[in-house]
Curated annotation (Swiss-Prot):
Gene designation: FOXRED2
The protein's name: FAD-dependent oxidoreductase domain-containing protein 2
Assembly description: Interacts with SEL1L. May interact with OS9 and DNAJC10. Interacts with TXNDC16.
GO process terms (BP): ERAD pathway
Keywords assigned by UniProt, alphabetized: Endoplasmic reticulum, FAD, Flavoprotein, Glycoprotein, Oxidoreductase, Signal
Keyword Flavoprotein: yes
InterPro entries reported for this sequence: Auxin_biosynth/cation_transpt, FAD/NAD-bd_sf
Lineage, highest ranks first: Eukaryota, Metazoa, Chordata, Craniata, Vertebrata
Organism: Homo sapiens (Human)
Glycosylation sites: N143
Post-translational modification: N-glycosylated.
Compositionally biased region (Low complexity): 663-674
Places the protein is found: Endoplasmic reticulum lumen
Length: 684
């Protein structure tokens, strides 16, 4: 009886049951979204996914978020500024100068609450990221190292395949969309004779006492190289810094990834001839040899080849050169490699076709302007590793830049997979000027990701209203309708922030006389960051975007307007900023965008066949300012309106209101009375 009852368990149904219950053979959990890495970019995407109520998981190899910052930068000082005071209460404006905070709805999760230092300690960033994940309840699986990623084709999947992730324990995870936010983690190494003698930035001592009285050679010329030099500048005999390219100063290139002033002490001692120095040479043209005393000698590689040795500096006479004053003829005690970082491609199967970009060697994966891999649909690169889109152009490789590009990617996917159109505000055309003025004066995404993210204004039929879309990737402009779910049938404006085209570069003198302009007619020659408005009658095509003029962020527009640069980055001057902008918009739309008092609208209604939009959308709908005696008098005195009251009544009213302060018969508004449509002041 017992045997007969147990027998079915060993038959085909029982076998299937056993297979289904076996953990190693069970179907892996399937999620809509997977995020690799719980650094700033990964947590930022997790926040947006959670707010949208999406199914997601974050995989982090370390026990806490932000593991990169537990070790780097090696000398513990961040170069992202923590400007706690701006004199403004506007939270969006303040993010322009907060380079460390992630975006969230919780004001407690601003980095200003975690450090008072202008250049914070990396430990504060670790603490901040931990609180960000914990406070918001982000779904992070810690101590989970994804060791392999491959594809599994499936017609039912969103993108025609699922991403299969295998962790260090052999557990398998499936997801429809994969976000890679692992940063750049592989030290860049150049192979040349003697390269094995170089200590890496990732492992070299950070104790200055270890360098006392030594001659040091640093390979590289980025912030990590100068950071290393700054730490030991006061204890070494001298420091020589060698790189194939000239030094790039961030204040000259306007790129925050170039050398920052906080690390440039070596430039002082070099130019003031205090033993330290900079040298330019391709590392592959040199060789480093070690002598019997443990000293390192640098020589041109072809001399080494002629001597037919690569073992010891004692076997040939060093240094060798055509001249006897070879710059690096003194031996070095230490050689330190600070050549930057590359993306780790090792965990990705070839089926993903996650190739490196040709222009960047192995540094970055090849992605589109939408941050999606060119090889696999549904695979997105976030954070520092996505910097190929705007390398040395904008801030996309840093927190204060990629927090906005991550949001843009999330918005693209909300429409692609959940039919949620790109967020937009629809307003009457009378609000067009004020909407642009507000955004260029406070928007942080436009300000930080200049030339990459831009606001797009989609005009409605007959230009009676518009939709305002914020921070759209401008290189995807031709696909705007497909990517956002919005229509651009009646023309559009694009608001971008730009530096002058000839103002940025490692060889530029950015402190020359007359480096800025202040007159409206010279706005197109503005050098410093300023708003530029592009008008298109039709949405540009992909071909127009691809073959746009050199160094232009967008195709040639129907019309273009530069708002003149401002020393205070405050574009609210009525005559210098707002009036030229409004006139430009009016010319593009062939309409009047001024605001009018009710009396003017009443006059227009009696004398014109077509009213200005402000009167159509306001006055005729019983909207606008309610007239009072004091307001009426102010308008007349300001010559915004003609005083149509009978002369006797006007004089009588004037006498009653002014008493002995004004002679009887003196006109209320000095000078010729002007119609409202001709008033210069009403132009404001």
């Amino acid at each position: 009886m017992g045997l007969s009852a147990a027998a079915p368990l060993w038959g085909p149904p029982g076998l299937l049951l056993a297979i289904a219950l076996h953990p190693a053979l069970s179907v892996p959990p399937r999620r809509d979204y997977c995020v690799l890495g719980a650094g700033p970019a990964g947590l930022q995407m997790a926040y947006f996914l959670q707010r949208a109520g999406r199914d997601y998981a974050v995989f982090e190899r370390a026990p806490r978020p932000g593991s990169f910052f537990t070790r780097y930068p090696r000398h513990r000082k961040l170069i992202s500024i923590n400007k706690r005071y701006t004199g403004k209460a506007n939270a969006e404006f303040n993010l322009r100068h907060d380079w460390n905070s992630l975006l969230s709805h919780d004001p407690r999760l601003l980095f200003r609450h975690y450090s008072r230092a202008y250049f914070p300690d990396a430990r504060d960033m670790v603490r901040y990221l931990g609180d960000f994940a914990d406070t918001l309840g982000l779904r992070v699986q810690y101590n989970t190292t994804i060791a392999h990623v491959t594809l599994d084709k499936d017609r039912q999947a969103w993108n025609g395949h699922y991403f299969i992730l295998t962790d260090q324990k052999g557990q398998v995870h499936q997801c429809s969309v994969l976000f890679v936010a692992t940063g750049l983690s592989v030290p860049n190494q150049v192979d040349f004779p003697g390269s094995e003698y170089a200590e890496g930035y990732e492992s070299v001592s950070v104790d200055p006492e270890d360098f006392v009285g030594q001659n040091v050679l640093i390979l590289g010329r980025g912030n990590s190289a100068f950071e290393t030099a700054e730490n030991i500048l006061g204890v070494t005999n001298f420091i020589h810094m060698l790189s194939r390219s000239r030094v790039r100063l961030s204040w000259a290139t306007h790129y925050v990834g170039d050398l920052r002033a906080i690390n440039n002490g070596l430039l002082d001692t070099y130019q003031l001839k205090s033993l330290d120095g900079l040298l330019e040479s391709d590392l592959t043209d040199l060789a480093i040899l070690k002598d019997s005393k443990g000293k390192f000698h640098v020589t041109p590689k072809f001399f080494l080849e002629e001597a037919n040795t690569n073992q010891s500096a004692d076997s040939i006479t060093l240094p060798q050169d055509d001249n006897d004053n070879f710059a690096m003829r003194v031996p070095y005690d230490r050689v330190i490699r600070c050549l930057g970082w590359n993306f780790d491609f090792s965990i990705f199967n070839k089926s993903l076709r996650l190739n490196s970009g040709n222009a960047f060697g192995k540094k970055y994966p090849l992605i589109r302007a939408s941050y999606e891999s060119k090889g696999s649909r549904g695979l997105f690169i976030l954070g520092t590793a996505s910097h190929s889109v705007d390398y040395r152009k904008s801030a996309g490789g840093f927190i204060h830049g990629f927090r906005y590009t991550v949001r843009a990617v999330h918005r693209l996917l909300e429409h692609r997979h959940h039919s949620v159109t790109w967020p937009a505000t629809e307003l009457p055309i009378t609000q067009l000027t004020s909407s642009i003025v507000r955004r260029v004066n406070e928007a942080s995404g436009l300000y930080q990701m200049f030339g990459v993210l831009a606001d797009v204004i989609l005009l409605k039929e007959n230009s009676t209203a518009f939709e305002y879309l914020e921070e759209f990737p401008i290189q995807m402009l031709a696909q705007l309708e497909t990517l956002t779910g919005r229509k651009a049938k009646h023309g559009l404006f694009v608001i971008n922030m730009e530096y002058g085209r000839n103002f940025s570069g490692p060889d530029k003198d950015v402190f020359f006389d007359d480096r800025s302009v202040g007159h409206t007619e010279d706005a197109w020659q503005s050098n410093f960051l300023h708003p530029v408005i592009y008008y298109y009658r039709y949405l540009p095509t992909e071909q127009e975007v691809r073959f746009r003029p050199a160094h232009w962020p967008l195709p040639r527009p129907t019309a273009i307007h530069h708002i003149v640069e401002d020393f205070l980055t405050d574009w609210t001057a009525p005559i210098g900023h707002i009036l030229p902008l409004r006139r430009f918009l009016e010319n593009c739309l062939d309409t009047d965008l001024r605001s009018f008092y009710a009396e003017s609208c009443f006059l227009f209604a009696l004398t014109r066949q077509k009213l200005p939009p402000f009167c159509q959308q306001g006055y005729l709908r019983m909207q606008g300012l309610v007239s009072t005696e004091s307001l009426w008098q102010h308008r007349v005195e300001s010559r915004l309106l003609r005083d149509y009251a009978p002369t006797g009544r006007r004089l009588e009213d004037s006498s009653q209101q002014l008493g002995d302060q004004e002679p009887l018969g003196s006109p209320l508004a000095p000078g010729p009375l002007a119609q409202s449509v001709d008033s210069n002041k009403e132009e404001l």
